[in-house]
């Protein structure tokens, strides 16, 4: 079916909260080598996670629109995940359920859409070109298909530069949650030109 030009409501009351929470500190000292055994071990531990979930604050900022929301991300198996965006009252603005070959999205009016590519669907329905296919790796602190990246002094991902389909995404990590094992990202910012996507993870549950 033809996808309409749907827009999430602009959740302005959350603006100051999200922007403050997602301020990224500068990185200290030189980064570690991507060839280090500590980095390879960290990647292996993260990739062995079968199920995980996280929730927190989401912001999308561009010249055309600003969207602020709460998010909930749940991975239940290989290529099976669920993404919720909610407003300050807790009402669902967007729910996306993805599994191999089938993606379903329900908007805040209860309208249901189906497709086979979650990233393309999100872009068409919300006007936000979120690199969802890559974000699934980046949110875990993994570089995905990117080969240009840097590590922090704890052998964790600190920056990613990824070029694909005319987009030049830069991902900067502001910290990690060491209460989880392995340590998972606590906040991050994606940017491409004037577009910015900010995520602050309140907590992680990993299995």
Swiss-Prot record:
Q: Keywords in UniProt for this one?
A: Cell outer membrane, Chaperone, Lipoprotein, Membrane, Palmitate, Protein transport, Signal, Transport
Q: How does it sit in the membrane?
A: Lipid-anchor
- Its GO CC terms? cell outer membrane
Q: Which Pfam families match?
A: LolB (PF03550)
> What does the annotation say about its assembly with partners?
Monomer.
What is the similarity comment for this entry? Belongs to the LolB family.
Function recorded in the entry:
Plays a critical role in the incorporation of lipoproteins in the outer membrane after they are released by the LolA protein.
Protein name per the record? Outer-membrane lipoprotein LolB
Organism of this sequence: Salmonella typhi
Q: What is the lineage of its organism?
A: Bacteria, Pseudomonadati, Pseudomonadota, Gammaproteobacteria, Enterobacterales
Q: Which gene encodes it?
A: lolB
């Amino acid at each position: 079916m033809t996808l309409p030009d749907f827009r999430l409501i602009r959740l302005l009351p959350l603006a100051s909260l999200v922007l403050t929470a997602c301020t990224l500190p500068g990185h200290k000292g030189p980064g570690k080598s991507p060839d280090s055994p500590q980095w390879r071990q960290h990647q292996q531990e993260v990739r062995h996670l079968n199920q995980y979930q996280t929730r927190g604050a989401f912001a999308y900022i561009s010249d055309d629109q600003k969207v602020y929301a709460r998010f909930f991300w749940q991975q239940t198996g290989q290529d099976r995940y669920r993404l919720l965006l909610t407003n300050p009252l807790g009402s669902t603005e967007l729910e996306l359920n993805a599994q191999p070959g089938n993606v379903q999205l329900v908007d805040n009016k209860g309208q249901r859409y189906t497709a086979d590519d979650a990233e393309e669907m999100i872009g068409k329905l919300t006007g936000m070109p979120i690199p969802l296919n890559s974000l699934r790796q980046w949110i875990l602190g993994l570089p995905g298909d990117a080969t240009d990246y840097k590590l922090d002094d704890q052998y964790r991902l600190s920056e990613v530069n990824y070029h694909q389909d005319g987009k030049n995404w830069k991902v900067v990590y502001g910290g990690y949650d060491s209460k989880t094992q392995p340590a998972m990202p606590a906040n991050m910012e994606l940017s491409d030109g004037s577009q910015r996507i900010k995520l602050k993870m309140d907590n992680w549950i990993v299995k």
